[in-house]
């Protein structure tokens, strides 16, 4: 049945133009009649001629005989009377015309040395006005004719000679004329212009035969009665046929030229609007109703068009949608599905011998009873509907039953908008009553869902492969940690979080009955789950969930037994170690009086209140640790356990509700609030008075008004804060509102202060409410009222209620927020789509490189380290007391040596006597210093004081991301292996460093600092066994964190950057005049992705060299050098006077210095030709002094700029007014306008600084303790040339300028920097690797490539991929013109073709060795016949395999022996091993010594056989060689080859389905270096130690 469905793969697509012959050959009918029907039947030669196929049930296709379902449709054609332009190609036709000679059709220029593409040839030819052709021996090959200029007018082209643009000289070029020119173009010329002789010739751009699409493409609708509604295309084709017929008729009749021309233009119009009905400058073709017709192009374009609407994404079957409702008792991994949906959604299950009985029951139940089945598919392909004949159906193997969805089925659940991959996750269905989907509360945050009426979609997988992929890749529990910011996306929320805080307070005590009910609430059915896939499995002391551990030890024994909440909660935790602080923590509280230090050891909560910091979706919180160390399953159970326990506590023991009483502050607080507001009002009045009296001081960089507003804001905000804090303080500890804020489940302290004390200032566009009309905000305020009340300060709280005007202002502020959100959604949605399209095919290959579908390399190693962000945790490099902690000096400084008694004798002996070892230790220390610090080179170790002389490298100052959490691994080791003194040989430690060395610098530093010899021996005091364990765990973690090949990291990066954008603000408000007025949020993100040339706020951050950076005065001199200074900047005001007395003046203020000047005037000035108009500039003395220049310099500068024609004099430096007078020579135009223009150009003269730098602010860098300059405006190349500037640290925010000045690598760094600034500024965090991939995609081509249709969509990708983004039709037309061949390697192409896209699991090929198949053992039935006990059994997914050599296989008791509990299975007292176990009873019939197959003489069961001897060491339950943590027990270890009799590959502890040994788990890869033989240096040296330890540990039943 399935074999017939194997499809051929489309490997590539060839685009091209149809030649007229191809159209005629491929057509089945010549269409000549515009009518559709004749006498009630489709008319032959009409537009729905039956030869083209049919859409009507009543007819069959006359070409293929198919009916309306099976016939795909066949094309017809129309013979056009005259050639017509193809509207999509008119601009290209014009280009070709400009390339070739109008008369002889040769290319106008010599062909040598030009690349053969149309645009290149056209660029060279379009200016040539003579046909030159090739250079030959006897001259030129061209005809030498003068060439016309060609212009496009509407749908026609016009030719005229240069200079004769009048109507007489114009010649209309119709299709016929151009066709004749194109037909004469030679083959080599066509190829030279980029055409292809086989697929696209120039004359084919002109239509002579029109292809008619079959009726299937344009089906008609039959209305009631006999009316038919035809499709838009049919109408259009009818118009074409009509006008074509008229044109033919008139031409044959010899009608006047203008009539023929009119009909030709009409036909051209119809042909054009058939193809595209949105041509600029042309009227649209309309239907009778006035609606524009939908053309062919419109069908392809846009979101609803063919490409994006029907090929890239389709509507699917087996999907359901309904409202979602919360359910506190459903598991995190489940979704409650309404029964109605479960009956409709089916899964096709194949009938086998194992499930035939179950499926027969379902078939009998039928479609209306759940669980039942809807259809049966027989082997011959027949589908039987079970609604009718289900009683007589006999199932056979190979049939397929479409059974109902049942509880436990995997389904895909989704909420739109799907912004990141956690918006689609797999859940297990749980079929329930009612009509809504039920959802666990913690899973709402990744979906961004709430329950105010949201709807969600559910999809049912339809094959075992998709089911397996959902379960292994998309399951909720596997998505708990997001690769976006390497932290959990789910945490405990809402009431559970509130309850969690109350539950773990110090005063929560529970009696025996309550404890029992809480423990009962935690569903214990999963207590035998595997303990996670970390190597740490080896460390369990007893099982998780040991109830007695808690019940045996109540916190209070007398007078009654009471347990604390912390004790009971510990029951839900695995054996983890965690130290953290809760949100109320006060650093001064050293004694932990507030119980804010959370300490959990071995899964037992010792102290601390658990709130959002520990149990929420926080980095390094409990959820994060459980997921990383114990696996996804265990994390999901933590959620379920906590929720069930706390919900039971909140419903029955300690209920919680909030009422109006929680918002009322006490009378004392009310007084405090009132006085704070009263004081603020007084301060505001004083401020207004000061401003009116001009006593207010102006703040730097602000106008007077801005300074006033800034002062006011400070006062009003202070009032709100003071009243808010006092209100909070007054609320008691058990106030319910405060409880929620402290737990982190809802609200913040601002909310509390607004509800109880004062709502505060309302803002619009970041300022106070603006005046609306005639200087008021609302009509009942007086004019120019600047007080708080009038400008939107709300002094009431929500509790007391707002006044009408306060309410109005509050609504204004709220309205702005709504508008902002609405606009932002559209903007960020588009940004997200562009990002995904640009990065969609970036995929990690087998070699860890990231490449595009075409094989272009984006990154040599993904994220520069090859790790998957999901498994990373943040780590700090510890540099405190560096030398003391890391350097061992046994032969020098006494304080740096290791003392006797601090380590074992053996190690001390080595350290104190071995000089070679000391050299190695010196090298290790020097390497560390070199990697972590930048500073003077190391002369000899110990001479330099690292703390003083060196600076830690920037990268290690903040937290770095690493796959191992060293602190936690070491803490676990210390608690597990009872340690006293370090006894690991230093050589062995250094050897381990070598073994763990990776290509990742940061990781190497982390490994060598945390496992440095001195710290291992003194600080951690590890023994060899513990050290080996630590090394193994680190090794396994590093392997596990490697990125999986074929992961779609591009899409992941796009989502990770796009999703935070939806949280960003659209408009960024800032206080005016503060230096940090740079664009942020969505507008800045758009600037980065679009690579905008003109930024809104271009700015540079300029660091200065040592001498200028240290003092503010020195920095000011540089500020003056850089800031642009014009004449206007220095002037207080400027004026134009008519002052005809040249040697004197009418202006009284200037009399003195003018007369003084004219007593001794300059000799060479001719005063008679000076103008009577005078430009007078009054200069600001303060500015002159501030810029350090004098008035004479300004006058001299103006003189120099204006040249000899002007006369400039200035007043004395000490005069009251500093004045510069400028007169020009008389001009012909002596109007005032002339002088106004002259004055303006004079004011624009630049006296100093850089032209683009409008303003420079001085700021202080607190970390570096130096001053730097922040500019408004940029000129990077000039600034870097300034000797006082530290060019290494100076940065600009203009990517284009950086790329031009410093090159592409610098641009890449600055894209990263700018992205980080925007995302951090919004309070989000995105892992570095996503932004680095984005930056690489934007810069990999060597130039900046924006994420727009002009950037990424222009280059490299195939036509199909580009057309799926934007400009669909244009791209496809161009592809046909240049006969592009699109090879289907990318994602888009394969999705369009309906093929499996090469991504993720679809990118895996199976390599099969056919020769090995000859030796294969045939599959046997897993039932033993008495005579074949030793047949090898092959395991299939549907049968368990028990090899006879598997020691714990009992034929009579499968369940016990195959229990999944690790602890039970290997415990000597486990029933399946106990000699008293019924299944091992010697009298059991299956063990009867007389049973033929167990005859004592049977060779395979001979009691003397060494491998089956009960006393044989290989079967001793305490045998050391079976410890799963023993390093020598490696699957690839030679001594345990699968052929060894004592190692059974089918032994249950190595079952391929065991989650902890999943073949897909990265940490158990057979090629894993940590399991390779090279690890023997760890396993052999301490085998004996390990075995002793294992013996000790195994007796308590831990394995």
Curated annotation (Swiss-Prot):
Which residues does the annotation say bind Zn(2+) 2? 101, 104, 131, 143
Residue ranges, compositional bias (Basic and acidic residues): 1585-1599
Q: Which of this chain's residues are annotated to bind Zn(2+) 1?
A: 61, 64, 71, 74
Q: Name one GO biological process term.
A: transcription by RNA polymerase II
Task: Show the disulfide pairing.
Answer: none
Can you list the GO cellular component terms from the UniProt entry? mitochondrion; RNA polymerase II, core complex
Q: Which SMART domains did the record assign?
A: RPOLA_N
Instruction: Return the domain comment text from this UniProt entry.
Output: The C-terminal domain (CTD) serves as a platform for assembly of factors that regulate transcription initiation, elongation, termination and mRNA processing.
Q: What is this protein called?
A: DNA-directed RNA polymerase II subunit RPB1
Q: Which organism is it from?
A: Encephalitozoon cuniculi (strain GB-M1) (Microsporidian parasite)
Gene field: RPB1
């Amino acid at each position: 049945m399935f074999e017939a469905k194997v499809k051929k793969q489309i490997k590539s697509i060839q685009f091209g133009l149809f030649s007229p012959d191809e159209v005629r050959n491929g057509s089945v009918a010549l269409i000549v009649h515009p009518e559709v029907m004749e006498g009630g039947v489709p008319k032959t030669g009409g537009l729905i001629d039956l030869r083209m196929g049919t859409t009507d049930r009543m007819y069959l296709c006359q070409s293929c005989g198919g009916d309306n379902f099976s016939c795909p449709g066949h094309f017809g054609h129309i013979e056009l009377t005259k050639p017509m332009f193809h509207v999509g190609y008119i601009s290209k036709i014009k280009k070709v015309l400009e390339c070739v000679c109008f008369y002889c059709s040769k290319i106008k220029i010599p062909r040598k040395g030009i690349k053969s593409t149309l645009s290149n040839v056209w660029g060279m030819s379009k200016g040539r006005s003579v046909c030159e052709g090739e250079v030959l021996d006897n001259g030129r090959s061209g005809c030498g004719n003068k060439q016309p200029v060609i212009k496009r007018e509407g749908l026609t082209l016009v030719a005229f000679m240069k200079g004769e643009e009048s109507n007489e000289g114009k010649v209309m070029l119709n299709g016929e004329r151009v066709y004749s020119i194109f037909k004469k173009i030679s083959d080599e010329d066509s190829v030279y212009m980029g055409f292809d002789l086989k697929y696209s010739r120039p004359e084919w751009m002109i239509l002579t035969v029109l292809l008619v699409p079959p009726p299937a493409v344009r089906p008609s609708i039959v209305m009631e009665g006999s009316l038919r509604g035809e499709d838009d295309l049919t109408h259009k084709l009818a118009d074409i046929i009509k006008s074509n017929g008229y044109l033919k008729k008139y031409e044959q009749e010899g009608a006047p030229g203008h009539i023929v021309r009119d009909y030709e233009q009409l036909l051209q119009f119809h042909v054009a609007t058939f193809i595209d009905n949105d041509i600029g400058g042309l009227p649209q073709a309309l239907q009778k109703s006035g609606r524009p017709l939908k053309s062919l192009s419109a069908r392809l374009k846009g979101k609803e068009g063919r490409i994006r609407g029907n090929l890239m994404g389709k509507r699917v079957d087996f999907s359901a949608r309904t409202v979602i409702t919360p359910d506190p008792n459903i598991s995190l991994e489940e979704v409650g599905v309404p029964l109605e949906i479960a009956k409709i959604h089916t899964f096709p299950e194949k009938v086998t011998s194992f499930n035939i009985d179950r499926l027969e029951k379902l078939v009998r139940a039928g479609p209306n009873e759940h669980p039942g089945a809807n259809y049966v598919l027989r082997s011959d392909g027949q589908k039987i509907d079970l609604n009718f004949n289900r009683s007589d159906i006999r199932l056979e193997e190979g049939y397929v039953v479409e059974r109902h969805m049942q509880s436990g089925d995997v389904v895909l659940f989704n909420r739109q908008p799907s912004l990141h991959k956690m918006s689609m996750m797999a859940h297990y269905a749980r079929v329930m009553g009612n009509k809504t989907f039920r959802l666990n509360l913690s899973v709402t945050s990744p979906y961004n869902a709430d329950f105010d009426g949201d709807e969600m979609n559910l999809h049912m997988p339809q094959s075992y492969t998709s089911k397996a992929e959902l379960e292994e890749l998309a399951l909720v529990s596997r998505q708990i940690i997001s690769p976006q910011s390497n932290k959990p996306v789910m945490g405990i929320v809402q009431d559970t979080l509130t309850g969690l805080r109350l539950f773990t307070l110090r005063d929560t005590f529970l009696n025996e009955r309550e404890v029992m009910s809480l423990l009962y609430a935690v569903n214990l059915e999963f207590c035998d789950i595997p303990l996670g896939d970390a190597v740490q499995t080896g460390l369990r002391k007893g099982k998780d969930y040991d109830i007695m551990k808690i019940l045996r030890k109540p916190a209070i024994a007398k007078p009654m037994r009471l347990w604390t909440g912390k004790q009971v909660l510990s029951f839900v935790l695995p054996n983890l170690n965690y130290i953290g602080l809760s949100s109320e923590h006060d650093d001064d509280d050293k004694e932990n009086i507030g119980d804010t230090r959370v300490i959990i050891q071995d899964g037992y909560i010792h102290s601390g209140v658990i709130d959002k910091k520990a149990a929420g979706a926080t980095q390094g919180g409990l959820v994060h640790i459980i997921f990383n160390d114990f696996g996804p399953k265990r994390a999901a159970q933590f959620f379920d356990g906590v929720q069930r326990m706390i919900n039971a506590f909140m419903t029955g023991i300690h209920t919680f509700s909030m009422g109006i009483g929680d918002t009322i502050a006490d009378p004392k607080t009310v007084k405090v609030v009132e006085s704070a507001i009263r004081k603020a009002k007084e301060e505001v009045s004083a401020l207004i008075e000061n401003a009116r009296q001009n006593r207010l001081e102006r703040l730097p960089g602000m106008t007077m008004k801005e300074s006033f507003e800034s002062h006011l804001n400070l006062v009003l905000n202070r009032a709100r804060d003071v009243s808010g804090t006092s209100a909070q303080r007054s609320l008691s500890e058990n106030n319910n509102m405060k409880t929620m804020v402290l737990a982190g489940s809802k609200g913040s302290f601002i909310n509390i202060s607004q509800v109880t004390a004062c709502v505060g200032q309302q803002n619009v566009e970041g300022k106070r409410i603006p005046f609306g009309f005639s200087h008021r905000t609302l009509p009942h305020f007086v004019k120019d009222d600047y007080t708080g009340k009038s400008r939107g300060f709300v002094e009431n709280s929500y509790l007391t209620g707002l006044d009408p005007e306060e309410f109005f202002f509050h609504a204004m502020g709220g309205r702005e927020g709504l508008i902002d959100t609405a606009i932002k959604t559209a903007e960020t949605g588009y940004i997200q789509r562009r990002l995904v399209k640009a990065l969609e095919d970036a995929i990690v290959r087998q070699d860890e490189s990231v490449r595009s579908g075409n094989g272009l390399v984006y990154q040599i190693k993904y994220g520069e380290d090859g790790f998957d962000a999901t498994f990373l945790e943040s780590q700090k490099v510890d540099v405190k007391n560096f030398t003391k902690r890391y350097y061992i000096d046994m032969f020098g400084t006494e304080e740096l040596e290791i003392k006797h008694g601090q380590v074992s004798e053996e190690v001390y002996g080595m350290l104190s006597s071995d000089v070679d070892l000391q050299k190695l230790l010196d090298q290790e220390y020097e390497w560390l210093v070199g990697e972590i610090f930048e500073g003077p080179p190391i002369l000899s170790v110990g001479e330099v004081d690292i703390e003083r002389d060196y600076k830690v490298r920037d990268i290690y100052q903040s937290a770095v991301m690493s796959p191992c959490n060293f602190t936690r691994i070491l803490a676990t080791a210390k608690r597990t292996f009872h340690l006293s003194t370090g006894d690991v040989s230093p050589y062995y430690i250094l050897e381990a460093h070598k073994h763990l060395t990776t290509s990742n610098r940061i990781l190497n530093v982390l490994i060598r600092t945390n496992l440095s010899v001195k710290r291992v021996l003194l600080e951690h005091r590890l023994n060899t066994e513990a050290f080996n364990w630590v090394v193994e765990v680190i090794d396994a973690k590093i392997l596990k964190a490697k990125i999986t090949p074929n992961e779609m990291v591009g899409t992941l990066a796009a989502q990770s950057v796009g999703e935070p954008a939806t949280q960003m603000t659209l408009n960024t408000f800032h206080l005016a005049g503060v230096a940090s007025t740079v664009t942020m949020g969505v507008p800045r993100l758009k600037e980065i992705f679009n690579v905008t040339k003109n930024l809104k706020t271009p700015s540079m951050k300029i660091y200065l060299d040592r001498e200028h950076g240290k003092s503010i005065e020195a920095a000011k001199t540089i500020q003056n050098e850089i800031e642009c200074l014009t004449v206007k900047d220095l002037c207080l005001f400027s004026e134009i006077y008519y002052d005809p007395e040249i040697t004197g003046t009418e202006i009284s203020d200037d009399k003195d210095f003018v007369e003084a000047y004219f007593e001794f005037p300059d000799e060479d000035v001719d005063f008679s030709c000076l103008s009577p108009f005078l430009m007078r500039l009054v200069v600001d003395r303060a500015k002159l002094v501030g810029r350090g220049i004098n008035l004479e310099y300004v006058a001299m500068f103006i003189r120099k700029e204006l040249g000899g024609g002007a006369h400039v004099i200035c007043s004395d430096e000490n005069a009251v007014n500093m004045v510069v007078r400028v007169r020009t020579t008389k001009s012909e135009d002596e109007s005032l306008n002339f002088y106004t223009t002259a004055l303006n150009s004079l004011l624009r003269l630049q006296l100093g600084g850089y032209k683009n730098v409008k303003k420079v602010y001085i700021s202080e860098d607190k970390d570096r303790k130096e001053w730097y300059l922040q500019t408004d405006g940029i000129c990077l190349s000039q600034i870097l040339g300034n000797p006082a500037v530290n060019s290494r640290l100076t940065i600009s925010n203009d990517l284009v300028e950086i790329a031009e000045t410093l090159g592409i690598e610098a641009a890449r760094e600055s894209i990263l920097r700018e992205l980080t600034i925007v995302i951090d500024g919004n309070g989000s965090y995105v892992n570095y690797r996503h932004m680095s991939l984005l930056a690489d995609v934007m810069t990999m081509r060597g130039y900046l490539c924006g994420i727009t249709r002009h950037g990424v969509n222009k280059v490299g990708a195939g036509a199909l991929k580009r057309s799926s983004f934007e400009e669909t039709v244009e791209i496809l037309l161009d592809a046909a013109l240049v006969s592009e061949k699109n090879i289907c390697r990318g994602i888009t192409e394969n999705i369009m073709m309906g093929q499996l896209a090469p991504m993720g699991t679809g990118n895996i090929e199976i390599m099969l060795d056919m020769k090995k198949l000859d030796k294969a053992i045939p599959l046997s039935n897993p039932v033993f016949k008495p005579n074949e006990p030793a047949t090898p059994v092959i395991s299939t997914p549907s049968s368990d395999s028990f090899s006879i050599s598997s020691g714990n296989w009992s034929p009579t008791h499968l369940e016990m022996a195959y229990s999944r509990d690790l602890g039970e299975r290997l415990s000597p007292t486990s029933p399946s091993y106990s000699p008293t176990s019924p299944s091992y009873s010697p009298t059991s019939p299956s063990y009867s010594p007389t049973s033929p197959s167990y005859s004592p003489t049977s060779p395979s069961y001979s009691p003397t056989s060494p491998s089956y001897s009960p006393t044989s060491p290989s079967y001793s339950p305490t045998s050391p060689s079976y410890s799963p943590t023993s390093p020598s027990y490696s699957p690839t270890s030679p001594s345990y080859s699968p052929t060894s009799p004592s190692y059974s590959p089918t032994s249950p502890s190595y079952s391929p389905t065991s989650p902890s040994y999943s073949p897909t788990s990265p940490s158990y890869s057979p090629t894993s270096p940590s399991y390779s033989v090279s690890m023997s240096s760890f396993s052999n040296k301490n085998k004996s130690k390990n075995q002793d330890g294992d013996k000790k540990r195994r007796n308590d039943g831990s394995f």
